[in-house]
Regions:
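Histidine-centered acyl-transfer/condensation active-site motif
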Residues: 135-148, 167-204
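Acyl-group handling in specialized metabolite and lipid biosynthesis
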Residues: 28-32, 39-46, 97-111, 194
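Hydrophobic/aromatic-rich structural module bridging two neighboring secondary-structure elements via a short loop
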Residues: 63-103
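Short amphipathic alpha-helices and their capping loops
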Residues: 1-23, 83-92, 156
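Acyl activation and transfer enzymes in specialized metabolism, enriched
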Residues: 39-64, 183-202
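Glycine-rich active-site loop/lid that clamps phosphate-bearing ligands
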Residues: 146-168
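Gly/Ser/Thr-rich phosphate-binding loops and adjoining beta-strand/alpha-helix segments
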Residues: 3-6, 21-53, 69-85, 140-143, ...
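Helical lid/core segments from catalytic subdomains that handle acyl or acyl-like groups
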Residues: 93-151
Length: 220
């Protein structure tokens, strides 16, 4: 895990950063439905898991722009940008109705990511611990699949004043609408390092990456 320190005075969002870390600490979140029809069909055609395919594309999108890889070292009050960020996914245990966090390293190579993500999930199924280790995994973002509901809105709250810059992404069950499969995706980012454009851009990039991925013959 490596990062670079960002000069807050030279940071291109310095004014916004100052306002939303000193005067009005808050986050910004959005829920929108995206068309996953082609990605679902691709997953079925290649006999791969839709969930892992989506997680890969989400991780690729968030690693494509520095704005989504920001962090804050509260001990030294330094703004930083990680070289890469990795998803924390979750395994749900039906018998106990609890979740276990799963750390999965992001690899740009799809096959390597897919293989490791599947292995990580299988390993997590053997434990019942909620073993988040944020001290040793600071460059990780939350990626949670809410498989029981195709919801319309979701908001994740954090304590006032807590400068949590890692993206928090949730998505729900897809459902058919007018012949297409639509899936709700919620994006939460700290307002100090992201605005409406950057939140909306996650959806735009996801749609682009899904289109390219679904057209290729990889993954099977």
């Amino acid at each position: 895990m490596t990062y670079r320190v960002v000069d807050k005075e030279q940071y291109y969002r310095s004014g916004v950063f100052r306002h939303f870390t000193e005067d009005c600490k808050c986050s910004t979140s959005m829920t929108a439905r995206i068309d996953v029809t082609d990605l679902v069909e691709h997953s079925r055609r290649t006999d791969t898991k839709f969930y892992i395919n989506f997680l890969y594309l989400l991780s690729k999108v968030l690693n494509s722009r520095d704005d989504y890889k920001m962090g804050y070292l509260w001990q030294s009050e330094e703004l930083i940008c990680y070289d890469s960020i990795n998803p924390i996914q979750y395994v749900f245990h039906e018998d106990m109705e609890t979740c276990t966090p799963v750390y999965t390293t992001y690899y740009e190579d799809y096959e390597e990511f897919y293989r490791n993500a599947v292995s990580d999930v299988e390993s997590a199924k053997k434990t019942r611990e909620y073993g988040l280790d944020m001290m040793n995994h600071p460059n990780w973002f939350d990626a949670s699949y809410i498989s029981w509901l195709s919801y319309d809105s979701l908001n994740v709250e954090l304590p006032d004043g807590y400068l949590h810059f890692a993206p928090i992404i949730n998505w729900g069950k897809y459902r058919e609408e007018n012949g297409r499969l639509m899936m709700p995706v919620s994006v939460r980012l700290n307002h100090a390092i992201a605005d409406g454009f950057l939140v909306a851009n996650v959806y735009r990039l996801l749609e682009k990456e899904m289109d390219v991925f679904s057209r290729c013959v990889c993954g099977g």
